Amino acid sequence: MRKLVFGLFVLAASVAPAAAQDAASGEQVFKQCLVCHSIGPGAKNKVGPVLNGLFGRHSGTIEGFAYSDANKNSGITWTEEVFREYIRDPKAKIPGTKMIFAGVKDEQKVSDLIAYIKQFNADGSKK
């Protein structure tokens, strides 16, 4: 009986929904990104590229930004899952990237950050 209960517990935990995304909390997480990136109306490239319309875009394609060859040639299209992998450890996902950032390790913060970034169209307007 204990094995059955334990098995059901493990099964329930493995199918638990992903962390809910909270754009307002994501805006707070994004504050650590503001040193290098901008987003929203009037956003401009800084040390890092503008992040408007990130999801669905190919890596290394924002006009006017000097990407590393690693980013330009990565073949990545930004999806939520690819971004999760990248933001946890940028240099592991794209070896040779110029992004100097240790990564966001907290899964809830990553989910919230995604929710915040997803709000913005390529022109910086909110969806």
Curated annotation (Swiss-Prot):
InterPro entries: Cyt_c-like_dom, Cyt_c-like_dom_sf, Cyt_c_1A/1B. Keywords: Electron transport, Heme, Iron, Metal-binding, Photosynthesis, Pyrrolidone carboxylic acid, Signal, Transport. Cytochrome c2 is found mainly in purple, non-sulfur, photosynthetic bacteria where it functions as the electron donor to the oxidized bacteriochlorophyll in the photophosphorylation pathway. However, it may also have a role in the respiratory chain and is found in some non-photosynthetic bacteria. SUPFAM superfamilies: Cytochrome c. Pfam families: Cytochrom_C (PF00034). This is Cytochrome c2. Residues 1-20 form the signal peptide. The keyword Iron applies. Belongs to the cytochrome c family. Heme c binds at C33, C36, H37, M99. Gene3D superfamilies: Cytochrome c-like domain. The gene is cycA. GO terms for biological process: photosynthesis.
